[in-house]
């Protein structure tokens, strides 16, 4: 199993709500960031460097939050 290391934790405020971002390093030097909305709802961003993965994740997080707040009308079958 690949050994990963938690290298940074930060909270991101979006529209008055705080979201935890955890950043991990892999043995090969690459990184990934993770935000857990629920046990079955997680977003992950991959990157080569810590800076790259943080930029990607901070761009993705508002979109992920917004998509979870959208209400889709139920579809009916005719």
Language model: regions and residue ranges:
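A short, structured beta-strand/loop element
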Residues: 19-44
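Short N-terminal "domain-start" leader segments
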Residues: 1-27
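Mixed-charge, Lys/Arg-enriched low-complexity segments
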Residues: 1-2, 40-78
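Homeobox/homeodomain signature
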Residues: 9-13, 33-34, 51
